[in-house]
Amino acid sequence: MLYHFLYPLSGQFGLFNVLRYPSFRIVAAGLVSLLIGLLLGPLFIERMRVLQYGHSNVREDTPERHKKKAGTPSMGGALILLAVTVSTLLFADLGNRLVWAALLVTLGYGVIGFWDDWLKISKRNSKGLAGKKKLVLQVLVVLAVYYGLLTDWQPRTTDGFPFLTIGSLVDLHLTLPFVPTHLFSPSLGWLYLPFMIFVVVATSNAVNLTDGLDGLAIGPTIVSSMTFLALSYVAGATIAGFSLAEYLRIAYIPGAEELGVFCSAIFGAGIAFLWYNTYPASVFMGDVGSLALGGGLGMLAVLTKNEVASAILHGVFLAETVSVILQVWSFRTTGKRIFRMAPIHHHYELKGWAEPKIIVRFWIMSIMLALVALMSLKLR
């Protein structure tokens, strides 16, 4: 917004010329998002406490220490979304469809998460929105954004009959980490859309599963946002006419550098939220936060052509999800459990690990995996 309103005035006010640089707007978005989260955090937490919008997602088989967390203010993800949205709208180029796609999927998933949280709070149980209904809504959000923003509808006429042809604004080729795009980058064609939906929905639900300990989900989310900031910038930026993507032999995505503003906004909001969510947490993000952030990260993976690399970057989220899948499969087929409890962070809790130790070690793993993902830029 500031880019559109103030940059045209740079001729009269030279200071506004800095808005032409994505690098400046990326830093500014992160700082503003951080300040919004830090300043509004206490007010939000107190309001949730007064309204008794507390954590009620406590299962009967949950570790004993978690039962003490019942009543802690929840739905802190709404504050994250506010900070991310305001910062992105202020500093991003609003003519960039990629930015809108990432933001709208994030907000759409936030609405789904809010509905889920509201049902849990109003009915005082851990069930919330039915799993199948939630999944259908997640798919519909991605479809709406894809056909509404990422599709080029081209009117044509054949034999006097008008019709529309569809051109995707998203590259339908699959890119692999550590493999130069000119050597191997197969086109998925029409299969790319279901693949895209899978990446976004799976990432969203994986973050949701990880959000079980104080600060556990937001830590890797912060790491991922900074990693995607770097990945998006090199995918779209040109310096003195020189394409970083061409030099690194990765897919060139025009306008992808603007996604750095969105990534920075997530980073700033995430740091601010962690200030209040760190052990012992004063607020939980709820599904409104975990589903939204996961959806946003999934879209970033798609829009920057790092769908496969995101499996490395999001290794912590992936491990949590796989642990649940294996646990359910093992119990249904053999009647035995592989882990003491799933997701796997609860397994370590029941082994006697202190909650902060589990959280920090998962953060360390997330940082290590992010470094591997970044290494894939050069090792091709």
Curated annotation (Swiss-Prot):
InterPro entries: Glycosyl_transferase_4 (IPR000715), PNAcMuramoyl-5peptid_Trfase (IPR003524), PNAcMuramoyl-5peptid_Trfase_CS (IPR018480). It is found in: Cell inner membrane. Its EC number is 2.7.8.13. One of its GO terms (biological process) is regulation of cell shape. It catalyses: UDP-N-acetyl-alpha-D-muramoyl-L-alanyl-gamma-D-glutamyl-meso-2,6-diaminopimeloyl-D-alanyl-D-alanine + di-trans,octa-cis-undecaprenyl phosphate = di-trans,octa-cis-undecaprenyl diphospho-N-acetyl-alpha-D-muramoyl-L-alanyl-D-glutamyl-meso-2,6-diaminopimeloyl-D-alanyl-D-alanine + UMP. One of its GO terms (molecular function) is UDP-N-acetylmuramoyl-L-alanyl-D-glutamyl-meso-2,6-diaminopimelyl-D-alanyl-D-alanine:undecaprenyl-phosphate transferase activity. Keywords: Cell cycle, Cell division, Cell inner membrane, Cell membrane, Cell shape, Cell wall biogenesis/degradation, Magnesium, Membrane, Metal-binding, Peptidoglycan synthesis, Transferase, Transmembrane, Transmembrane helix. It is a multi-pass membrane protein. The keyword Repeat does not apply. The keyword tRNA processing does not apply. The chain crosses the membrane at residues 26-46, 75-95, 98-118, 135-155, 160-180, 183-203, 222-242, 259-279, 283-303, 311-331, 357-377. NCBIfam families: mraY. Catalyzes the initial step of the lipid cycle reactions in the biosynthesis of the cell wall peptidoglycan: transfers peptidoglycan precursor phospho-MurNAc-pentapeptide from UDP-MurNAc-pentapeptide onto the lipid carrier undecaprenyl phosphate, yielding undecaprenyl-pyrophosphoryl-MurNAc-pentapeptide, known as lipid I. PANTHER family: PHOSPHO-N-ACETYLMURAMOYL-PENTAPEPTIDE-TRANSFERASE, PHOSPHO-N-ACETYLMURAMOYL-PENTAPEPTIDE-TRANSFERASE HOMOLOG. This is Phospho-N-acetylmuramoyl-pentapeptide-transferase. It comes from Anaeromyxobacter sp. (strain Fw109-5). The lineage of its organism: Bacteria, Pseudomonadati, Myxococcota, Myxococcia, Myxococcales.
